[in-house]
């Protein structure tokens, strides 16, 4: 890998980590197109993922600081409620990641065909997120396309912070399914939330905050493989390439994260579904 290839791969990671089109799938596709050897790619992957985590922290630093300040008051306030729901959303992915991560990776491998199939699944989820809430809702505002479904607790009251615990858990299941390459993490979480009736402005923030710890945990598990001798860091990727990939992923991640927040609030996600469909068809034709 040279620094130009690293720059391009970093850009791809930064853009696709937040857009609902699968960063893992696009990294695999672009790596194949550029002819980049898989040797040493683990350390590059860890590096660019850390860059996109940093992008998220920068974009959401105010809400994160507010959540931490409220949480450490050690009383059940809005911030504590929100943090607990994020923790609940992480239960499914923690279960899958800790117990089945290696089996899932062995099952799917680096197959581009798998990426194509998962992109089709992502496309279906995105279309459903635009259409299903309106079909299920009563009194939907057709002109605005905004579902009138509201997140309620079992007691019948509207959920605190706009999302209930069961909705947070279901969204977490969506995140757990996204371990498959080509199944977008942001796409599945946002789509699952919208299908469950969570408002767009709520999912625009919750979907990005809920993935921070799982992404860091995933990279930590990869590093544990190195410690255990199952993988090697530093093989074939120079510090210059790592730096180029990190900077590209961080800057493009900042832009993509801010853009995606605006898109989730206002735009139809079906346009991304069309993109996923086109890419999947191209994979099936040329892979």
Residue ranges: model-predicted function:
Residues 1-287:
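Multi-pass membrane proteins that catalyze or facilitate reactions on polyprenyl-/lipid-phosphate substrates
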